[in-house]
């Protein structure tokens, strides 16, 4: 997912070694590092915003990753052991790149990140150059993986073959949302309020409109705003109301969404609201009356109220450790680590291999026809050489102040 300027991209903290270990640092920078350097462990790095406006996303991915790392290392007969280090990028692209360089100096061999889009796009340029395997839990822009055509059919960013996503791409969120609204007959007249200054929001909107047209789903009005005009949504809501919209699609983040819900309540306007992954987090937004989010729907790959054993165990561990209910970002991050672990086992890579060799073998493994993964955010997950994940989204609705599965 992208945050404002396209969430989803992790950044890594820079650790500068003392002069006595410069030679070892140079080996790591070249993709080296021996088994003795790593103590038999693969070095996994994580980057995200752990402070600042997007911290809710970064901390969720950090927590989910940590739980997975702890589980892997606790396996008595496990052949894979992991060393894990996080870095705060404050949702800033430049800081994210600096974080990556620092983690690289630490000896990072695989990157699980970054969390938000703009920083992730910046970091992928570095990992692609270094041929380091990168799996992001939540950076959803197609610019993260590259090789995707834009709305005009032009490919402006070449495919970065080392980068993969656990989350849905922005276009896929738009397509899936239109299909879900149509199939479930959630609304007959749809209004869209989107952020015209945000690639994340625009990308979802374009695909939503295209799919809605194919399905015969009526979009009666499209109301844009920008980051500079995101404090009052009276105009947009009045336009939706005048157009007779009985459902408003919100391909935006939870901060502006909270203002839209508050203003709609003031106006006495009560359409259904349907969001995307950026909406996840609205229930923990400080100062927001969560009763206003009652009935809000969104698509997500994860439901904390699911009854399968894996989800119940994860939710229980997360609540005990972090005193909070995990969201999809935490679940996606957990799955990232477990996918990496499974790919390491299947590929036969070892911690003493060079970064580039590890990357090539993991790419070949994760894209092979016989590689599938069952996790918190889906079963039978696969990855193609485009870097995109194939898995089914779940419909969620906010009920009594909690996310509840609509498909249970």
Q: Where do the model's predicted regions map?
A:
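Extracytosolic ligand-binding ectodomains
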Residues: 2-15, 31-408
């Amino acid at each position: 997912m992208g945050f404002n300027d396209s969430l989803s991209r992790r950044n890594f903290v820079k650790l500068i070694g003392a002069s006595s270990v410069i030679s070892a640092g140079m080996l790591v920078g070249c993709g080296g590092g021996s088994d003795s350097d790593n103590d038999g462990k693969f070095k996994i790095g994580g980057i995200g915003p752990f402070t600042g406006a997007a911290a809710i996303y970064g901390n969720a991915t950090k927590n989910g990753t940590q739980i997975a790392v702890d589980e892997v290392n606790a396996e008595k007969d496990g052949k894979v052991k992991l060393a894990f280090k996080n870095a705060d990028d404050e949702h800033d692209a430049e800081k994210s790149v600096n974080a990556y360089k620092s983690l690289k100096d630490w000896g990072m061999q695989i990157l699980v990140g970054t969390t938000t889009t703009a920083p992730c796009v910046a970091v992928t340029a570095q990992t692609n150059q270094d041929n380091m395997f990168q799996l992001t839990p939540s950076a959803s822009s197609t610019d993260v993986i590259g090789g995707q055509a834009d709305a005009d059919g032009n490919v402006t960013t070449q495919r970065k073959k080392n980068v993969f996503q656990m989350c849905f791409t922005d276009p896929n969120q738009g397509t899936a949302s239109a299909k879900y609204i149509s199939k479930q007959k959630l609304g007959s007249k749809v209004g869209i309020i989107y952020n015209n200054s945000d690639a994340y929001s625009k990308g979802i909107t374009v695909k939503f409109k295209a799919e809605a047209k194919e399905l015969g789903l009526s979009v009666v009005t499209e109301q844009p705003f920008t980051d500079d005009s995101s404090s009052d949504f009276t105009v947009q809501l009045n336009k939706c109301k005048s157009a007779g919209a009985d459902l408003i699609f919100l391909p935006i983040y939870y901060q502006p969404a909270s203002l839209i819900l508050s203003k709609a309540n003031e106006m006495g306007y009560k359409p259904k609201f349907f969001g995307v992954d950026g909406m996840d987090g609205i229930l923990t937004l400080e100062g927001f009356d969560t009763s206003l989010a009652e009935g809000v729907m969104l698509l997500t790959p994860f439901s904390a109220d699911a009854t399968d054993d894996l989800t119940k165990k994860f939710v229980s561990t997360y609540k005990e450790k972090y005193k909070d209910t995990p969201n999809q970002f935490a679940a996606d991050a957990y799955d990232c680590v477990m996918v990496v672990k499974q790919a390491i086992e299947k590929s036969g890579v070892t911690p003493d291999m060079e970064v580039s060799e590890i990357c090539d073998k993991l790419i070949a493994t994760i894209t092979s026809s016989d590689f599938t993964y069952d996790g918190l955010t889906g079963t039978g997950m696969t990855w193609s050489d485009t870097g995109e994940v194939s898995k089914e989204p779940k419909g969620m609705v906010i009920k009594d102040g909690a996310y509840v599965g609509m498909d249970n």
